[in-house]
Amino acid sequence: MASAEIIAVGTELLLGQIVNSNAAFISEELAANGIYVYHHTVVGDNPKRLKDVIDIAEKRSDILIFTGGLGPTEDDITKQILAEHLQKNLVEDAFHMNEITEYFASRNRTMTENNKLQAVIIEGSTVLNNDYGFAAGMFLKENNHTYILLPGPPSEMKPMFSSYAEPLLVSENTEKNVLESKIMRFFGIGESQLAADLNDMILAQVNPTIATYAGDNEVVVRITATAKTKEEASALVNETEQEILRRDGTFLYGYGEVSLPELVTAMLLEKNITISAAESFTAGLFQAEIARFPGISKIFKGGMVTYSEETKQSILEVSPQTIKENGVVSSECAKEMAKNVSRLCNTDIGISFTGVAGPDSLEGHPAGTIWIGLHVAGFETEAYQFVYGRDRNHNRRRAVKQGFQLIKQFLDTNK
């Protein structure tokens, strides 16, 4: 099976001035067609280093896809260096030259000589039309390798690749397989623990493959299988998925690109369950997160940020006796906050966050000690304690996600 390498040319990429989004786009498109990308390479606008990269890439890859370096300036060197490497001439493409000439003429502007370079191609190439710019792309087969040259700007590269390069590449790749992937999302278990639970599967993996990634207070597992048909690949993925669920399914919250807050918000909207929030150490993070989603005004009625004892009492109407006897970092305070915000905002669910963000301790409780209260109309109010680390903002973000998870667990249990 053919292997591909994406070579991004541009010093600005190495300096971090531009993110290499082209490589991600091309890799995803090729994966959908069963073509494996094994290497991403970034090289600056330097002739010698680009030559070295080409030499290395040819030894390990069948398909070399270049992005960038096709423009009119002196540092646009991709086609010149590749032509020299392949011992081929550069020739003018009449169609693109006419496009460039007409563009400048229609605007009564003088075309500089260097703009003509964008219509120059490597001899023997199949020209890839640029529908959104001037620089012509190229598709070339030589010495058992396929070379594809694409412009750097994503607005030009993406349509050129999708409309012209990809169909050619897929038709040439007669041994293509189908690649099928599934993303599983877990909360409440660390990456190291999940990896340990799946260790024997990861060590023995061939097809499908299993990869774990640490996300924002969650763990993502990607299962990828290849087969001759989509049905065969899906069957391989599903078999592995079921074994993962058997081991750690209690921590699974969803699939694909849907985040935990987005999933829970959709569940609340679907069931038309209203919600409000009372926040202390999270200082409005939960409310800011839930407010990100369209249509939220149908179910999110509002909330309160009561950071001090005084505002907990005066605004949220938490009993002074509750705070005096138990402190603000307590089950009793969390429950009362959740009940009161639900009553004051007239909502089905009230959720509260109180605790020690860190790095210092509070009321004898170490940093990272938090309580989340959950009040649901018709059910007993509950409070849940968690102990995290000393990183203040990490604790706040994690608590918010934990709050969404508690709501999801309630909704799953009481359908």
UniProtKB/Swiss-Prot annotation:
Pfam families: CinA (PF02464), CinA_KH (PF18146), MoCF_biosynth (PF00994)
CDD domains registered for this protein in UniProt: cinA
Domain of life: Bacteria
Coiled coil: none
Similarity comment text for this entry: Belongs to the CinA family.
Name of protein: Putative competence-damage inducible protein
Gene name, Swiss-Prot/TrEMBL: cinA
